[in-house]
Amino acid sequence: GFNPCGETCWNKPTCHAPGCTCSIANICVRN
């Protein structure tokens, strides 16, 4: 399925998509 938080966050502390947060695996997931 479509993941609106599909960006990764290895090199940046935040996710750009609204309602998303950086998971422990350095992937943006729904907050």
Curated annotation (Swiss-Prot):
Q: Note the InterPro entries from the entry.
A: Cyclotide, Cyclotide_sf
Looking at the keywords, is Nucleotide-binding present? no
Q: Which Pfam families match?
A: Cyclotide
| Disulfide bridge partners, by residue number | 5-20, 9-22, 15-28
In its UniProt record, which GO terms are filed under biological process? defense response
Q: Does the keyword Cell wall biogenesis/degradation apply?
A: no
Q: How is it modified after translation?
A: This is a cyclic peptide.
Record key words, sorted: Disulfide bond, Knottin, Plant defense
Record cross-link Cyclopeptide (Gly-Asn), residues? 1-31
Which family does the record claim for this protein? Belongs to the cyclotide family.
Function field? Probably participates in a plant defense mechanism.
Domain text: The presence of a 'disulfide through disulfide knot' structurally defines this protein as a knottin.
Name used for this protein in its record: Cyclotide psybry B
